[in-house]
From Swiss-Prot:
Entry annotated with the keyword Transport: no
Annotated localization: Spore core
Entry's family note: Belongs to the SspH family.
Name of this chain's protein: Small, acid-soluble spore protein H
Keyword Electron transport (UniProt): no
InterPro entries listed in its UniProt record: SASP_SspH (IPR012610)
Organism for this UniProt entry: Bacillus thuringiensis subsp. konkukian (strain 97-27)
GO cellular component: endospore-forming forespore
Upregulation: Expressed only in the forespore compartment of sporulating cells.
Domain of life: Bacteria
Family matches, as HAMAP family: SspH
Entry's Gene Ontology BP terms: asexual sporulation; sporulation resulting in formation of a cellular spore
Amino acid sequence: MDVKRVKQILSSSSRIDVTYEGVPVWIESCDEQSGVAQVYDVSNPGESVHVNVTALEEK
């Protein structure tokens, strides 16, 4: 995935399924300069990780 698509997903009112390493995640934010997104595991929203947007996959 790229930064542009992550930003589109963040601004969308629709639910768009995204995975990171096969795990469903919610995208919380995206840093356009570094290409890093903050994501939460859907099943464990208490923990967030910062990942490169290229590691995210839209399902």
